[in-house]
Amino acid sequence: MRCTLIVNRRAGRKGGLPVNLGTADDALAALAAHGIAPAVAETARPGHATELARAAALAGDDVVIAAGGDGTVREAAIGLIGSHVPLGVMPLGSVMNVAHMLGIPRDPQEAAAVIAAGACAEIDVGRAGGTRQAYFLEAAGVGIDAALFAYGNAIDAGRWGAVWGALRLALRYRPRRVVLELDGWRVELPALMVSVANGPFCGAGLRVAPEARVDDHRFDVRVFGPMPKAALLRSLARPEGHEGSEGREGREGREGREGREGHEGQIYTFKARDVRIAAPRGPLPGHADACPLGSTPLRFSLLPGALRVLVGSSAALAGEPHTLASAGPQAPSHPTPAQ
């Protein structure tokens, strides 16, 4: 197997403190134990993993492996959109939403075993547009979460004074009216936040869309309406497998527009490929995979099956994976993002 390991040695640090469960050397040793000897390329700046992944794919690699956190994985993935080259993940970050969604264990030996096994799937990628353009694997959206992510990024960088700003914002934030266009269908309603989810998780492991699947060719659009902040937090921190008050019955026809009222507020779930969000009473902040995106109006579009990935047995998939050898040389019908 010809492959490149893209390494971010700064992954797994929150607030300037190391909190990761492995190192790049652990990843290399685990891969070697499974007979995989990759070329190593280290990231030096933001966006560098995208360049390295694209170069590896063009050079003829069979697999590109990202060793780092969710940010490194997302950057490497962007470089492989539209390529037949699959992405493997060696989790070195503090949260690892993408690894969780793809069924990749945190243990380096177990993660390397997933790569060696070669189970492959084509997953969807989200594209967000507004004042900025961005791709996302987890979720995007607008509202209180987008406003708080800016503080979270400052805290991650060690600026602890941002904690107080985040607390003030959380206490003062009020629902705002939003206008959604979902594949052309329009709805207006009040919301604390709107998540356009490709997968179940975003940010610090928040379960923004428990039923979302990364290969079902639909976004799960979750609208969190007026409710106490504690109820919102409980909903986002809900344990895996517990659906809560809206339940499955609000999602029976997954091709359509769905949702129902929860007993502590309103949480609506919709399915759509193309989502536009506007705020008639002034702009709302947006994010893509917890990174600032600008403000409304924003558009989110889906690239179905745009990224080939190596997955574990517990991946959050709607379909079944196939072996890498049977994937074939055909690339998904999406253009590679411009450099």
Locate predicted features.
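Gly/Ser/Thr-rich active-site loops/lids in small-molecule metabolic enzymes
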Residues: 154-161, 202-205, 210-231
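Glycine-rich phosphate/pyrophosphate-binding beta-alpha loops
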Residues: 141, 145, 195-210, 292
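Glycine-rich beta-strand-to-loop/alpha-helix junction loops that act as flexible
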Residues: 9, 67-69, 92, 198
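A generic structural signal for short beta-strands and their flanking turns/coil linkers
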Residues: 174-176, 190-192, 215-219, 271-275
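ATP/NTP phosphate-donor binding region
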Residues: 1-63, 257-260, 316, 326-339
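Catalytic core of DAGKc-family lipid kinases
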Residues: 32-34, 43, 81-193
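Short glycine/serine/threonine-rich phosphate/pyrophosphate-binding segments
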Residues: 49, 71-76, 97, 123
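ATP/nucleoside-binding phosphotransfer catalytic cores, i.e., glycine-rich phosphate-binding loops
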Residues: 182, 213, 223-339
